Amino acid sequence: MRIVIEGCDGTGKTSVAKILADHYGCDVVHMTGDDPKDFDFYWQSLRKNNVVYDRNVLGELVYPYVFDRKKHLKDEQSDGIISFYKHKGVHFFVLTANEGICKARLMMRGNEDQRILSNIPYILAKFKALAFEYNIPEINTSQRSADRVAKEIIKVIEEKENKK
């Protein structure tokens, strides 16, 4: 079982990833800005089984603009990685929430990077566009608890698995 949870900061990815990992008996891998973010890194990460990824390749298509840095992947590389992940049965989900909720959640954390706070509308819009482009289920977490979101994801995964 491999699950990728993507989305804007403050949408509940980490909380949902932990619940899913407990449910499926998986590890959580939290990908961060310190990871290499190149083609080999994402390709090799697929070697791990029984994992819930808290962020993965989609973030590399969003955050270079936010942090004013060079992209580490070419568009065709990210397309290839996502296609291959899906071919291998990786379950992708994009979490969204309304802008105000994301900001409130991030403010409660404290110490959030100002570049993220000032770019929430862009980050949300970009993740929504990527979910549409890659046909990835999008779940709005604005009025849902992490438990409820995890249950929705489990239901989608079970329906997919039963179709095989």
Protein language model features and the residues they cover:
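NTP-dependent small-molecule kinase module
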Residues: 111, 124-164
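Walker A (P-loop) ATP-phosphate-binding motif of ABC ATPase nucleotide-binding domains
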Residues: 2
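Conserved substrate/cofactor phosphate-moiety recognition/catalytic segment
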Residues: 8-11, 15-68
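A glycine- and Lys/Arg-enriched "phosphate-lid" helix/loop adjacent to the NTP-binding pocket
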Residues: 68, 82-130
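A basic- and aromatic-enriched beta-loop-alpha substructure that forms the phosphate/nucleotide-
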Residues: 51-95
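Conserved beta-strand scaffold positions in the cores of enzyme catalytic domains, especially
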Residues: 26-28, 52, 92-94, 136-138
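Short, solvent-exposed loop/turn segments at secondary-structure junctions
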Residues: 10-11, 57-59, 98-100, 144-146
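Hydrophobic anchor at the beta1->P-loop junction of P-loop NTPases
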Residues: 5
